Amino acid sequence: MLPRLATVLLSALGASASVLPTTTTRDLASRAAPVASLCTQYAYLKTNGYEILNNLWGIDTATGGGSQCTYYNGAVGPAVAFSSDWTWRGNDNTVKSYVYANRVFERRLVGDIKSLPTSVQWSYNTTNVRANVAYDIFTHTDVNHPNSSGDFELMIWLQRYGGIWPITESSTGSPVERVTIAGYTWELFTGWNGAMRVYSFLPPSGTSYNSFSADVKLFFDYLGQKYAFPASEQYMLIYNFGTEAFTGGPAHFDVSRFQAEVQV
């Protein structure tokens, strides 16, 4: 992400979705010595069909200091494992980093994509942190638009810490609705980041989805049905998963398995 109640049950967006398998035990890749260490501001690694980025784009707002290193821990079959250690101080309400793994794919119109199956297993050892764990996807009418912004942003938060909030135009901070998609319950927030419309799906307060498997295309389908998202005009630019770090730490974010696919 850039610097920034009606209950609806969609049975049509449920169990029939294409998803990827998950395992019930942590994979060994994230426990071993890292394959690569990424510790500079935009340290980057492309491997196994994924890009790993130590994306410290908000480091200048860390007035109290801090640092972050991200580690590629290896391939787990068709998936990847990565982790990140960080500590940040100063400006509690600004994002210091969004480290992530991004699936490499050929850009296509969202409407031409049949499914976006994904699965992830993650954990967080936290010390007074303000952070989230989230998927982040940008779309734009221009297939060659940079992947750092878009006309639309879809965020799927799996957890949040320290009372942080998504972008919202609600004066009370309330979600616009509660909805069930892909078998999970979400609270939907929406607002603007400059000229970009942002849709953020969050678990209900007190809920954490540490093991998540779903078809992300179902979220776009829902936005098209309910909020007129123009899938036939918008190219998907990026498809990633990671953590936005605000302040706190020392913290250790561990992704033992992340897999994402683009099926057309």
Swiss-Prot record:
Main location: secreted
Recorded effect of pH on activity: Optimum pH is 6.0-7.5.
GO molecular function, one term: cellulase activity
InterPro entries: ConA-like_dom_sf, GH11/12, GH12
Catalytic activity: Endohydrolysis of (1->4)-beta-D-glucosidic linkages in cellulose, lichenin and cereal beta-D-glucans
Annotated signal sequence range: 1-17
Protein EC: 3.2.1.4
Keyword RNA-binding: no
UniProt entry tagged with the keyword rRNA-binding: no
Subcellular location: Secreted
Pfam families reported in the protein's UniProt record: Glyco_hydro_12
Induction cue: Expression invreases increased 4-5 days after inoculation, but is not detected during spore formation.
GO biological process: cellulose catabolic process
Name of this protein: Endoglucanase cel12B
Origin species: Pyricularia oryzae (strain 70-15 / ATCC MYA-4617 / FGSC 8958)
Lineage of origin: Eukaryota, Fungi, Dikarya, Ascomycota, Pezizomycotina
